[in-house]
């Protein structure tokens, strides 16, 4: 008689292996049907389009989950060094189509949905963007997660699950109005709550120094609930995890304070604790210094570090014996990348855990911390640097303040020993800034506490070394690196521009999707008549499609054979949307002056959000919409010039406008844009760039040849020279009649007849205190735009330059960026190993 199975033997039947994946169209249909009825509890008589979207999302998710589980099993067995990417922002956009693309499911799903009498594109449009970021910094984090999974790295993204992401922008009477982004209202099919890993985070309280060590007592506790989202690599069966924390009040929250019986009040007050993960702060490149924001920064750091240490100590969930208690090997198993200074508290928090909790001695703990952490700098604008008041730390994080003081003291002792008597250097390099309000300089803390510090484009990394962190570079030059940003070609070509991707695949195969340098193989085709025609045809189709979208969504009719001149990014003075406005007004004046002349027709599209408290940025939006109101309704102009403000610019709108663009505007003042990544997306999608020598534009010009971009304006050294000499806007105003005319029209109310003074603040700024020197680049910009017009009249020559740009965009893949981080900062090697899918036994 067969021996009865033990419980543990029986449990071996609980396996992902026996579960069928989506092999074909019939499987997709079956799974879709099952989810519609059993998961959503709907039939076809009552199902809404949103129900159909959710049924498809669950179908695709089923296919993903087996691979997700397999990947985690693989990491537990191999125990590789793990990469932790800490960011307060992950601007993911939509997930459905990206998941289908990366799993190779798009054709099967498309056909199955068609067979069911539905439209895949319509279902995709129902999904909310996950807008957990402001702009470039958050989108970079999302591209990096895609690349880390595609390169087979054991990587985790850690952030906050904001209940409300970046606000939705409405334009009302030409002004930006913010609306809350309730992106979770209908539920999120991609996330999985993990209450078993919920962790406590402490705030406030007091510090006690005892013979047994330091104790942080009488704290307020907030719980961090993790929500996991799968991040699939491209066709390699690797599925990594993005873990976002949500704040929960503990069950006894405030109840002890209300022993007089105000139970209801205590329960209502739970909201106060849970506000920590309520909303993303909508400031891009601006530091506000709010206590709730500091709480958010510590919340994500404290929860994440507990999680990292749990995973380091014990490889498997449910395994009761800690595998590792010695922290010597911690930096060999853990790399923490700080995405800007927002997660800077990782440094003092790791020190607190090592010294106070794990009883590691200070010097050893400091060595471990430095070897583990690395810091990416994203901005050189002084108003963006985080400088927290010491008084806020004293109250909120008293133990961390002590640790920061101790770190700073040792650091300054070291500097003083190397530069005796140089008191000014000590002041410049201190983490603590003295003054009326003592402040903690978080960037200095990051530089001191990390083994690697990187900028995000070559020119930016030079500015970081020569200016922002000059003293620190002199102290430890080997610490400073450059890692030029990149974008994922899966989302930013294959997903958003399938026509162009197919055209390229026909010529050079599919390898470029995971090795973008292969695009160089297109160079011999620059003069190929058929390829030129094919590329131009794809662009025209994209323009027609986007024109139809604009007509449907914005009720504006545009000329699809006009040049699509696109300027989309956060609205900020340094990005110089005002320079673009002056060009538009000048073009308008030229058409009015000589209506019979042949003009190259243009549709100028400007889009982006302004921080709600940034008066000048909001006024810039009003100016763009006001110029549009005049230009678009002038019968003399006709369809030769149109100005469109693209409302509520976000990832899903970028995916539509970028493939349709002819001209990409990247016109920040030289030395202000750290890198930019929009510039790379336009280049890859067949737009030509008009730009300054700033950020990654410099490297784009180097890769494609400066003659294949439209480069204009002051260089960094010219800007510095002008600063030394003193920038005088009036000189340009007096000597350039077209500039004077445009400024006078804005100033006099020509574009705002009902409110003649509407734009006085803009004109006053431009004339008297313009840090970003708009007038200084006006003449060069106008001349450069004339060259753009001239080339656009010759479609064949234009398309040749487009092909050359696409062929030379390989460097700007986030796969290349992440490979450099892996080898030069994290000390790991990318892997092309295919993890076996769930239906195949593991080795």
Swiss-Prot record:
Q: Which residues make up the annotated site Participates in a stacking interaction with the adenine ring of AMP? A: 76
- Cellular component terms, GO, for this chain's entry? azurophil granule lumen; cytoplasm; extracellular exosome; extracellular region; membrane
Name the residues that bind AMP.
43, 197, 310
Spell out the residues of the site Involved in the association of subunits: 109, 143
Query: Where along the sequence does the record put site: May be involved in allosteric control?
Result: 156
Modified residue annotations for Phosphoserine: 15
The record's account of how the chain is modified after translation: Phosphorylated. Phosphorylation of Ser-15 converts phosphorylase B (unphosphorylated) to phosphorylase A.
Listed GO biological process terms: glycogen catabolic process
What reaction is this protein's catalytic activity?
A: [(1->4)-alpha-D-glucosyl](n) + phosphate = [(1->4)-alpha-D-glucosyl](n-1) + alpha-D-glucose 1-phosphate
Q: Please provide the record's keywords in A-Z order.
A: Acetylation, Allosteric enzyme, Carbohydrate metabolism, Glycogen metabolism, Glycosyltransferase, Phosphoprotein, Pyridoxal phosphate, Transferase
Q: What is its EC number?
A: 2.4.1.1
Give residues where Phosphotyrosine occurs. Answer: 197, 473
In this chain, where does the modification N6-(pyridoxal phosphate)lysine occur? 681
Recorded hits in InterPro entries, A to Z, give: Glycg_phsphrylas (IPR011833), Glyco_trans_35 (IPR000811), Pyridoxal_P_attach_site (IPR035090)
User: Record-annotated residues binding pyridoxal 5'-phosphate?
Assistant: 569
User: For the region Pyridoxal 5'-phosphate, what residue ranges are annotated?
Assistant: 677-678
Tell me the function of this protein. Answer: Glycogen phosphorylase that regulates glycogen mobilization. Phosphorylase is an important allosteric enzyme in carbohydrate metabolism. Enzymes from different sources differ in their regulatory mechanisms and in their natural substrates. However, all known phosphorylases share catalytic and structural properties.
| Family affiliation | Belongs to the glycogen phosphorylase family.
Query: Its quaternary structure?
Result: Homodimer. Dimers associate into a tetramer to form the enzymatically active phosphorylase A.
Fetch the NCBIfam families from UniProt: P_ylase (TIGR02093)
Under which name does UniProt file this protein?
Glycogen phosphorylase, brain form
Identify the species of origin: Homo sapiens (Human)
Write the gene name: PYGB
